[in-house]
């Protein structure tokens, strides 16, 4: 059974590229364009991993991360934060809120897929 990945980003081009990349890499993918949608999708889709952009309308990726980590039933969901903000303070904030990994944009496709596989315990 394919692992489930939820992509959360408000930029359509990034979502389309990530969706294509991850489906070709064997993942079942759903997308959300804002924080509220993301939380609904985590509830219904039950992803193994959330690929979470930091800067979004309504709720930031930080807010979404905090809310996911506040729910014991979602404790096993891995969170990989993506952001153009690569300053040490932003990375530290994401990790302290419970993100498993923080990757800065731009990133290589191979690096991203490798990071996802590692987080999901795949070879």
Model-derived regions: residue spans:
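Receiver (REC) domain active-site loop signature in two-component systems and cognate sites
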Residues: 56
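Two-component/phosphorelay signaling modules centered on CheY-like receiver
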Residues: 12-30, 119
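Short, conserved "switch-loop" micro-motifs in signal-transduction and mechanochemical regulators
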Residues: 71, 85-86
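C-terminal output helix
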Residues: 107-117
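Acidic, metal-coordinating helix/loop segments flanking the phosphotransfer/catalytic sites
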Residues: 31-49
